[in-house]
């Protein structure tokens, strides 16, 4: 990983990312109402109907990771998680919690009181706040397993990075009138751009692990968006996303998760190289 000078980040990447993320908000009014209460229900699971849905979701997500990663010791979680990823995870979680708070306040999405306990932290259900720590931890477990068993497929994948940037920027231009679509795309574009700037060698590995993550993401995100219940726990304002769903969740959620996870890994590498004695500043 090439570590750019602080001035490059300050004068190039940060303004570009801020403009991408912030421009759709200029003079834009969120359209009130229009929440999609029902998801595309695949099957009804009665035991999920109730205020413990989010808690069940977290337990089902965490227990397999705890068993395979910690009990069976599939990877060195003490170094991989506690030493390398814990601080970046917390930092990115705080950024995305702020995003969640803002969009909840603006009416981009809301939470169905029939499926939560009713205790809030900064106007978010406490279960939602926990999501930002539990789900990334579980997702990074998949990344670590792929890292150990698949030895960095596709390398830095620069061609793929450029192709994704072009395609996603085109989609961004077409969806600037939808706040969730625009911010999800702009966050993804910004993170891919940053991975190019720092010449991050782990992009191919991340893409491989993220593609695998889409499988459990369909199930666990579906639990929150009406795939297995009569109504959705997380209800989206239909005017603020593109209307395309994978199973029951908006496709924009993929960009949300992509930006969150790659941000953790980029920040982890940045901190690791900054603290090491052998990094090279690029002027």
What does each of the following model-derived ranges do?
Residues 2-283:
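Aromatic-rich, lipid-facing transmembrane alpha helices and their immediate juxtamembrane interface loops
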């Amino acid at each position: 990983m090439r570590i750019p000078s602080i001035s490059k980040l300050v004068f190039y990447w940060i303004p570009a990312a801020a403009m991408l993320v912030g421009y759709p908000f200029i003079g834009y009014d969120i359209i009130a109402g229009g929440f999609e209460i029902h998801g595309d229900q695949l099957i009804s699971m009665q035991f999920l109907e109730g205020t413990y849905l989010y808690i069940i979701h977290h337990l089902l997500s965490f227990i397999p990771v705890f068993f395979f990663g910690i009990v069976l010791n599939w990877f060195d979680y003490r170094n991989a998680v506690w030493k390398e990823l814990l601080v970046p995870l917390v930092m990115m979680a705080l950024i995305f919690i702020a995003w969640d708070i803002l969009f909840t306040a603006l009416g981009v999405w809301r939470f169905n009181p029939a499926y939560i306990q009713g205790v809030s932290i900064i106007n978010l259900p406490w279960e939602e706040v926990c999501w930002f720590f539990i789900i990334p931890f579980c997702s990074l477990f998949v990344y670590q397993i792929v890292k150990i068993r698949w030895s960095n497929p596709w390398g830095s994948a620069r061609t793929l990075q450029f192709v994704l940037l072009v395609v996603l920027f085109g989609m961004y231009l077409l969806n600037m009138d939808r706040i969730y679509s625009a911010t999800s795309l702009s966050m993804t574009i910004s993170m891919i751009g940053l991975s190019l700037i720092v010449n991050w060698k782990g992009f191919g590995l991340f893409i491989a692990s993220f593609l695998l993550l889409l499988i459990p993401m369909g199930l666990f995100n579906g639990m929150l968006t009406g795939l297995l219940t009569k109504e959705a726990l997380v209800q989206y304002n239909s005017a603020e996303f593109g209307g395309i769903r994978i199973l029951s969740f908006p496709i924009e959620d993929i960009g949300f998760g992509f930006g969150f996870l790659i941000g953790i890994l980029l920040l982890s590498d940045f901190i690791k190289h900054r603290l090491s004695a052998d990094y090279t500043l690029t002027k």
